[in-house]
Amino acid sequence: MNKVLIFDRNMYPRGVKKNVLGRQRYGLKTIKRTLVHKPANKYVSRFTKQFHRRIIPIKQLDESKLDALSLRELEQLKLIIEEKQEEKRAQTHALTFFANLPTAPFGSSYTAEALGLRKYSGEARDPAHRIRDRFPRNHEKIYLEKEELMTTDLLLRYKNCLNSLNREQHQQILGDRVFSLTNSPSLAFSLAIIEEACIYYKYHFVHNLPIDPQDLFMYTITIMKFEYFNKLNMAKLCCVFNDNGHGDIEYRIFRQLCGKPVYDRDMPNTEYEVQQQTPGSFQYPAQQALSFIVTFARILRQIKERILQTKQPQFIRDFDQDRVSEQYQCGMISRLVGDQFNNHQCDDIGCQTRIQRMMSPWKPSLYFCTYLPKEFVEFGLHPNMPEEYNSFNVACSTTPSCSFASQQSKQTVQLNLQTKKQAKCKKLLTADKTNKGQKTNELRENRLKKDWSKEVDSIDFETNTTLQEDETRFVFIENDTSMKSAKIKENNGEENSDNEMELDLDYEDVETCETDINDTDSDDSD
C-alpha cells in the first residue's frame, strides 16, 4: 500500500515548493528564482511562423551609381550611414553612444571668469597635451589637492579639450579608458579611476555645468560599479559584513546594490528599492561607497534619456533630489573603502590574507616562460614604461627572450666568464668569416652545442657579419643593477666586454591561500 504524505501549504521553508507533477515520487523541489523572474513564453503563433517563412525582397543598390561617385562623395555617404546607424541604435537602447547629442553652448556664461575660477598655475601639464599623449609620462604630477581641483579652471580646460575632439579621437581615448578600467591590476588603481570620475562629476555639480553624455569621464561611470564590485568581491565580504551576525544578508544587499542576481525570496527589499536608497542608509562603508557610484550612474542615465527626448542640455541639480552629489567629497570613495578593510578585525586567517593582498600593490608572479617562435604575434609595451619592464618580453618577432630583474634584490648570482673559452670562440668565429656558406653555419652550431653541453656558468657568444639580427637576443645586467640589452646586429664585429649578470629575486612570505570566496553565494556569483 502506497503512503501519500500530505503537507500543509504554509509549512515549506523558503525556496522550497511542491512538485505538482510528481508529488508522490519526488516529494519537494527546490526552486531558485529572482523576484523579477518571468518565465519565457515558448508558444509561437501560426502567424509568426508564416511570417518568418516569407521571403522578403531586399532592395539592391545599383553598382553603376556607386562607381560614378567620387572618393569625397563616398566618404560623405559613409558618414551619413554611420550617423543613421547610431541614431537607430540610440532610439533602440536610449542609452548608448550618440554622436550628435546636443550639449549646452560653451559660451561666455561658462568661462573661468564667469564661474569665479582662478587660473591653474601648478606643476600639472596642460590638459590639451595630456589628452594628446593619451597616457601619463614617467614622474608626471597627477596628484592634486582638493582646492586645486575645485577652485581652478583645470577641469574646465579638460572639458573644453574633450568637447573639441572629433569622433575618432574620442572613441580612441574612450576605448583606452574602458580597457584600463576593466584590466586594472590592483584595487588602488581602480579606486583612483573611480575617484577621478566622481571628482569630475562633483565639479559639474558645484559649478552647475551642463552634462555631456559622450564625455570621457561621464560615460564610464556606469561601468565603474561592476569593476568596484569585482575588486571587492575578492575578499570574504560575508566575514567583513558580519559585525552584527548578519554577514550573509549584508552581502546579498551589496549584490543587489550593484545589480547582481540574488536568489533569496525573503530579502526585505527588492533590487530597485535598494538602489534608490541614499548612501547614509547603509551600515557598512563599502556599501556606502558603492551607493555613491550607483546613484551617480542612475542620475547620468536619466540625463541621457532626457537629452534624447528633449534635445536640450541638462544639469545634475535637476535630477539629484536627495542631494547625494552634495554629500560627496573628494577622496570619499577611497577613504570609505580604506576604513572598511583597515578597521575589520576577525580570527579568520584567510580573510585577513585576502585583505592584505587586496590593499597591496600589484606584483607579477611569473616563474618561467617559453621561447616562442619568431613568427609569433608581437606584444608591444608602452614606451613610457620603465626600462626594467621593457626588457620583460613574453614574445617578440625579433627578440624571443625572457628576462626579469627587480630592484629589491635579496640574492645575487654572479656568473663568471671563462677567458680561455672566449679566446677559442673568437678564433673560431674569425676563421668562419672567410667562409659564408653552409659549412660555417654547421661549425658554429656544433660549437654551440658542445658549449651548452658543458657545465659552465655562462657562454659568451660573438658575432660576425653572417649572423642575422633576428636570431637571438641577450640581456646583460651590470654591477650597478642597471639593465642593458645587447642585441646582435648585422655587420657588427665589435667584441662584447665582460659583463657580470645579476638575477634579482623578490621573496615574499606567503600565508594560507584559499580559493573559497564568499561561499554562501558561490553558485550564484558571476
Swiss-Prot record:
Cross-referenced Pfam families: Herpes_UL69
Record has Oxidoreductase as a keyword: no
Binding site for Zn(2+): C239, H344, C346, C351
Any one annotated GO CC term: viral tegument
GO molecular function, one term: zinc ion binding
Keyword Transcription regulation: yes
Keyword terms: Host cytoplasm, Host nucleus, Metal-binding, Transcription, Transcription regulation, Virion, Virion tegument, Zinc, Zinc-finger
One of the protein's GO biological processes: regulation of DNA-templated transcription
InterPro entries tied to this protein: ICP27-like (IPR008648)
Main location, first listed in the record: virion
Compartments where located: Virion tegument; Virion; Host nucleus; Host cytoplasm
Residues in CHC2-type zinc fingers: 239-351
Biological function: Immediate early (EI) protein that plays many roles during productive infection including regulation of viral gene expression and nuclear export of intronless viral RNAs.
Family according to the record: Belongs to the HHV-1 ICP27 protein family.
Protein name (Swiss-Prot/TrEMBL): mRNA export factor ICP27 homolog
Species the sequence originates in: Human herpesvirus 7 (strain JI) (HHV-7)
